[in-house]
Amino acid sequence: MATPLQYALIFLLWAMMAVIYAPLIPAALTLISPALSLTHWQALFADPQLPQALLATLVSTTIAAVGALLIALLVIVALWPGPKWQRMCARLPWLLAIPHVAFATSALLIFADGGLLYDYFPYFTPPMDKLGIGLGLTLAVKESAFLLWILAAVLSEKRLLQQLIVLDSLGYSRWQCLNWLLLPSVASALAMAMLAIVAWSLSVVDVAIILGPGNPPTLAVISWQWLTQGDADQQTKGALASLLLMLLLAAYVLLGYLLWRGWRRTIPRVDGVRKPATPLLPGNTLASFLPLTGVLCVVLLAILADQSTINSEALINSLTMGLVAAFISLLLLLLWLEWGPQRRQLWLWLPILLPALPLVAGQYTLALWQNLDGSWTAVVWGHLLWVMPWMLFILQPAWQRIDSRLILIAQTLGWSRAKIFFYVKCPLMLRPALIAFAVGFSVSIAQYMPTLWLGAGRFPTLTTEAVALSSGGSNGILAAQALWQLLLPLIIFALTALVAKWVGYVRQGLR
C-alpha cells in the first residue's frame, strides 16, 4: 500500500474509533460537574430511597461476584484437568449463549408470584426480596460461566498441567494445588474477569428491573430513572448516583486487592505437609448443573411461549441492528489490528470494565448535541461501544497467534502489506472472525439502555419488550419475547459454525 493511502487509512481508523469511544469524555464530565456542589450531594443523601437502594446493590453485587468465583473455583478443583473438564468446557456455551434478559426471564417465570413454583408449591414461594438476593444468585450462576470461560483459556497452558501432575504425584490435595499453583498462575486473568463482573453487576438495569427489588430498586435502576426524567434536579441526582456506582467499583477493587494481599500472606510454604483430600462432590454437581441451566431456560421458554403474539417490529429491529453493529465492528477491528498501534491500548477495554450507566449518559449527551437522538443510526452507534471490546476479546488472541513465518515468506515474495493482509491474514482469521461476529451480534441483541435512551423509545427490540413485559402481563407473551431474544443469537452462532465448517472442507488448511 502506498504511504499516503496508508496514512489516510490510519487517520480514518482513528477517527472512527474516536467517534465510537467519544462518549467516555462527556461521561466523565457528566459525573464530575454535579459532584463539585455540596448541595447536590446533600439532595442525593436526603432521598429516602437511597439507603435501601444502596444496600440492595451491595448485597446483589457481592453475592454475584463471590458466588461466581466460588462456583468457578469449585468446578476447577473438581474437574481440571481431565476428560470431565473438557466435556464441561464443550458444554459451557449452552449457558454462555443465553442472553442475561432471557435467563432472568426464565428465573422470573419459575420463582415469582404467579410462576411455575407458585402454581405447584405456593408455600415455597420466596418472600419479598428487598435485598436483591435473587438477583445476586441469578447473576452468580450466569457469570460463573463467563468466569470459567476466561479461566479455561489460561488453564490450557501445558506448563500448568505439568506442575499440577508433579504436585498430585507428591500427594498434595487439590485445594493445596489451588493455593500454590492455580490461583497465582491465573491471578491477572482472574482479576480482569472479576472487575468486569463487578462493574456489570453494579450497573445492570434490565436484569435488575426483571428480578431486583421494585420499590426502591437497586442504585443503578434508580439512577436510570432519575437520569431519564425531565427535571434538572432529578438528572443531577442521577448523575451523582452514577458517580456513586463508580466509587463503589473503586471500593470493590481496593477490597479485592487487600483480600488478595492478605490471602497471599497466609499461604503456607510447600513444606511437605499433606492435607487430607476434601470431597469433590459440590464441584462435580455444579459442573453438571451449569450447562443444564441453559438447556432448561430454552425448554421452559419454549413451553410457555405464545408464538402468535411475537412482535415482528421488535424482531426485525433486533436482527438488523445486531447484524449491522457486528459487521461494522468486525471490519473496523480487523483493520485496527493490522494498521492500528502495535502496543495494547487499555482504553479499548473501558466499556466492559466500567459501569455502563455513565457511558450511556455520555452517549445521550453527544446524541443530543448532534441532534441524533431518536434515530436508528444513534442506536447502532450506541451498541458499538460494547460490541467492539467483546469482539476484540475474541479477535486479538487469534491475531497474535498468526505464525510470523508465513508473513516473512510473503514478504520475501515481494507482497505488499495490504496483499499480505487480504490473502494471508484474513483467511487465517476467518474462523475467529465468524465467532467474533456471532458474539458481537449477541452483545448487540442484549443492549437495553442504549436502545431505549438513544432511540427515544421509537425502536422496540426483543430486549426492551421483554423488560417492559416483565413488570406485568401475559407470561406467554413475555416468554415469547425472551425466547426469540435467545434464539436469534443461537441461530447466528449455528450459521457461523456451518460457514466455518464449509470453508474448512473447501480449504483444507483451515480445518
What residue spans do the PLM features occupy?
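Helix-loop-helix hairpin linking two adjacent transmembrane segments in secondary transporters
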Residues: 226-243, 247
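Short cytosolic juxtamembrane segments of multi-pass membrane proteins
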Residues: 264-276, 457, 500-511
